[in-house]
Amino acid sequence: MYRLLIICVLILASCKQEKPEIELTLAQKIANAHGFENWDKVKEFHFTFNVNKDSSHFGRSWVWKPKANEVTMLTEKDTITYNTSKIEQESINTDRAFINDKYWALLPFQLIWDTSATLGEPFKVEAPISKIELNKVTLTYPSDGGYTPGDAYDIFYYDYFIIKEWVYRKANANEPSMTNTFENYEKFSGIKIAQDHKKAEGNWNLNFTNIKVITE
């Protein structure tokens, strides 16, 4: 009886020590699959945003210091630095460009950061470009606030939560405004970034170069 009592006490003690597993949200699963758990160590994020269409090229470079709330844009004509925690009137256009370019680079993390947006329920569907069966979930923004209110994004991802394609629908229109791939993934200090975003047809590629992630 005494031995049985000891065993029961040990079992109860073991149960108390075991912490229940917390079920991650879909947004967390997608973000973590792309390295979000490493973001808190990031001091600087450098990247160049490019759009290549046929023989034309557009590009601008960024240095983002998230812990210092500082962003610098570098183009052939200008170098502009501003504080993201207090955006002055003269910095709005630069900030608008940064938000756009960062969104393409770090879409999985925006699922966590953009708390005002709504992430719907996922379901299986044929992806628009690859024509393979993927999970689809829609991210919808509120109709007021932000630079592009009311927009929606249909995100197509694998069962292991890596994003493969997306459809952008301006103002949550029924028809796609733009459809692109997420490809040529590479890790930078644990952050997984799709370096190329192509269309189904045409010589068009939105891509990232000069990526550098500096951590603490």
Predicted regions and their residues:
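Sec-dependent signal peptide recognition
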Residues: 1-7
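C-terminal motif of bacterial Sec signal peptides marking the signal peptidase cleavage site
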Residues: 11-14
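Flexible, processing/modification-adjacent segments and terminal tails
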Residues: 18-23, 85-151, 173
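N-terminal mature ectodomain segment of secretory-pathway/periplasmic proteins
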Residues: 19, 23-92, 119, 128
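Intrinsically disordered terminal and processing segments
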Residues: 22-24, 33-37, 117-126, 202-216
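Ser/Thr- (and often Asn-) enriched beta-sheet segments in non-cytosolic proteins
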Residues: 46-48, 61-63, 72, 79-81, ...
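Gly/Pro-enriched, hydrophobic low-complexity segments
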Residues: 132-216
